[in-house]
Structures are given as C-alpha cells and as structure tokens.
C-alpha cells in the first residue's frame, strides 16, 4: 500500500504541475484584445460620462447589444477631477449591469494634473502618475476587462507638447512599477492615439518610441487608436498600414483596438440620418478589417445646442431620446449576433461584407457615396430576405432571382440580404 500511495502521490504532483503549466500557457495566450470573447463580429463599447450615467442607462446599453463601456479615471486632483468621481462604485455599477469596463487612466496634460501646484514639493510627476495608475489597476484587476494608458497624448489638450520626453519617462516608470509589483492585467492598451502612429509623421517620435518600448516589455498588450475621419471606409487601408508597421517592429502579437470613434449630428453640417449612416459604416468597416474591439463615441449628447459639434456625438439625445444611429445600429446587432466575418471587398466602389450566422450568409452592401446597382450571386433554390435599416428597420422580399442572383441598390445607407436554404 505504501508503494502504491507513493506512486499515486507522485502522479498527483505531476498532474498538478501539468495543470499549472497548462493554465499559465492558456493565460499567456489569452493576453491582449485577440482573446476578447464576444457574441458579435466586433465587440462593441460606448463612451459614458462618469458624472451623469445612470443605472437605467447602463441597463439600456447592455440590452441594446453593447458589451463594454469606456470611461476615464483621473487622480483626485481638482484640476482634472473636479467632481471627485467615485470610480470604484462606478465600476461596480457597470459590472452589476453585466457590462465590461474599458478604463482609461489619465493624469492630466502636465502628466500629473495641469497646474504647477498639483505637483507637491519633492515629488516627480512620472512617479506620481505611475503610483496612481498601478495602484488603481492593482485594486480593480478582477473587475476591469480593458485598461488603457492615456488618451491622445499626440493632442495638446491631453499632453503639453513640451513634455513629450517626460511622457516617455512616465511610460517607462509605469512599466517598471507594473513589473516590480507583478501587476499584469490581460489587456492593457495604449495610448489612444489621435493620429495614426508610425505612418505619415503626425505622431511625435517620443510617443512612438514609448509605445514600442512598452509593448516589447510586455507592459502594453495592444495599441489603441482614435481613427476619426470624414468617411469610415478609408480606415480599412489605415488599419492595414498600422498592422504592417507593428509587424515591422517585431510586434506581431500586438493587436489593434479602436478605443474612440464617432460622428456628430449638428446643423448645418450633418443630419441625424447621416450620422446614423456613418456610425453604422464605422462598425461595418471595423468588422471588415478584423478589429476585435470598437468603442463608439458617445452614448449621450453632451449638450442641447443643435449647432455645436461637441454637443452632438451621442446616439441618444441629451434629453434621453433615441437617435437614428441608435436604432439602426442596434437593430443590426440583433441580426449579426453569433455571426462571423467570411469576406470583405470593395470592388467597383461597392463595399460588401459577408457574415455567416448558422446556415445563413448575411451580405451587407453599401457605398461611400452615390447609389450603385449590385447583384449577390446565389444558386437556384436559395431563399433571400432583404433588411433595410433606414429610416427604420423593414424586412421584405429580395424580389425575383435574376442573372444568377438577387439585385439591390447599394447606397450610403447599408442594406442586408440574408441568403439561406
């Protein structure tokens, strides 16, 4: 019995070691946005205002198909956090609504605050930011799905351009402290670039160098960008350029997250229906490029002026009314749930994204501009259902099968043809 017990004991020890090794390997593979689990072609987040978001809002966000919400966390300094938001409580509220949090850690455009008096005597701003960021990560690792370090450091609003070298030092300090304290969340992205890094020279070299160093040290798992632009379709080529630049720098494991992007509806520039078209296409082109995470800016309009761009990025009005962008996107999400990308092309000025859901192929068709006739090739005997999302959702027949398929007019307002047996 002793011999048998010893053998069993050794076997159990080996089994335990193997389990630890396998778990460690699984965890390592799971790091980064590539490991995000989602019910949709792209995991979708929406930006919220920590000071005004209600529990009813959070529940409605989840019911609409969003899986994440993004908000900034700032240190307890009046210059950058005048309301002294209770962030731990907000994180709990987000979790209670069955949403995941994207938390952007930001210290102020002087790295620590915005005024000289924010920096206490003898303290280094780099250390103060690192202490704050690492401490907050450590306290909430289990409750936050995605951490983002900084927000648009290539924009003077969020980083004083005179402090580029200091930012590089602050990033290095943060990574060193994370390693020293063994703080290693599954997803840490940076830095929420306003411009496309490594392409075109719009991002200062110090910021690019800081990112590469942080990614190579396994401090940052992914890069985060804010690809604002007049029309969404041009983002596809930019994603490819960025991917190539990351690979060139031996950052093949570094993923791409879109941590902020949206369109405002404001007079006389853009109607609510045009905003809805652009927001919808923003999601589609992100899915087409295989990007795993998109944060839409924003949940609710900031103000009530019809002529202010900054007041009108929401998919909900300031008064809480659903805008056309909300309706179109959320109706699409209901259909696209549990679907995966099959293919994408933009031949002859028509964008075609094909998704597969169960036994159905979902062909989403649109153009960046004028209408174009398009035919979806379909073998005889297949059924086709057409879904329009604008100005409201309508299901109907695709019409008769002609020229080996079903025809539609593609426009700036996407239409979906669902092909099934």
Listing of model-derived features with the role each one plays in the protein:
Residues 2-15:
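Bacterial N-terminal signal peptides that target proteins for export
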Residues 13-24:
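Bacterial N-terminal signal peptides
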Residues 31-135, 144-154:
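N-terminal substrate-binding region of glycoside hydrolase catalytic domains
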Residues 39-42, 65-67, 97-101, 141-145, ...:
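Short, well-ordered coil/turn segments that N-cap beta-strands
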Residues 53, 82-85, 113-220, 226-245, ...:
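Active-site cleft segment of glycoside hydrolase catalytic domains centered on the general acid/base Glu
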Residues 267-329, 345:
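Aromatic/acidic polysaccharide-binding cleft in carbohydrate-active enzymes
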Residues 345-382, 389:
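Carbohydrate-binding surface patches
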Residues 397-421:
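C-terminal beta-strand-rich structural cap/linker in extracellular carbohydrate-active enzymes
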């Amino acid at each position: 019995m002793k011999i048998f017990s010893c053998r069993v004991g050794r076997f159990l020890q080996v089994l335990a070691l193997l389990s630890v090794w396998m778990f460690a390997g699984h965890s390592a593979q799971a790091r980064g946005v590539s490991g995000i689990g989602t019910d949709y072609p792209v995991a979708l987040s929406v930006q919220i205002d920590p000071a005004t978001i209600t529990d009813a809002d959070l529940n409605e966000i989840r019911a609409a198909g969003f899986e994440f919400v993004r908000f900034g966390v700032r240190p307890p300094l009046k210059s950058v956090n005048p309301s002294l938001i209770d962030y731990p409580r907000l994180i709990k509220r987000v979790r209670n609504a069955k949403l995941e949090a994207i938390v952007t850690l930001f210290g102020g455009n002087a790295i620590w605050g915005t005024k000289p008096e924010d920096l206490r005597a003898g303290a280094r701003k780099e250390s103060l930011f690192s202490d704050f960021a690492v401490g907050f990560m450590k306290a909430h690792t289990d409750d936050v799905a995605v951490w983002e370090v900084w927000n648009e450091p290539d924009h003077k609003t969020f980083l004083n351009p005179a402090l580029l070298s200091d930012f590089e030092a602050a990033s290095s300090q943060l990574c060193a402290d994370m390693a020293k304290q063994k703080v290693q969340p599954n997803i840490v992205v940076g830095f929420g670039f306003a411009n496309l890094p490594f392409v075109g020279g719009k991002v200062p070299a110090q910021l690019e160098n800081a990112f590469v160093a942080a990614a190579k040290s396994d401090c940052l798992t992914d890069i985060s960008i804010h690809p604002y632009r007049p029309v969404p379709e041009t983002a596809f080529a930019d994603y490819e350029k960025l991917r190539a630049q990351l690979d060139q720098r031996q950052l093949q494991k570094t993923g791409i997250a879109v941590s902020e992007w949206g369109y405002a509806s404001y007079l006389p520039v853009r109607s609510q229906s045009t905003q809805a078209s652009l927001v919808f296409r923003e999601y589609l082109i992100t899915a087409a490029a295989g990007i795993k995470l998109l944060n839409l800016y924003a949940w609710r309009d900031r103000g009530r002026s019809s002529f202010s761009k900054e007041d009108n990025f929401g998919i909900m009005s300031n008064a809480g009314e659903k805008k056309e962008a909300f309706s179109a996107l959320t109706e699409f999400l209901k259909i696209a749930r549990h679907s995966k990308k099959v293919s994408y092309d933009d031949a002859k000025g028509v964008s075609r994204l094909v998704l597969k859901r169960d036994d159905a192929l979902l062909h989403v068709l649109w153009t960046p501009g004028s209408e174009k006739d398009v035919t979806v090739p379909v073998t005889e005997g297949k059924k086709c259902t057409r879904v329009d999302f604008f100005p409201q959702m309508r299901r109907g027949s695709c019409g008769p099968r002609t020229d080996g398929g079903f025809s539609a007019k593609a426009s700036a307002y996407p239409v979906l043809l669902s092909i099934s047996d």
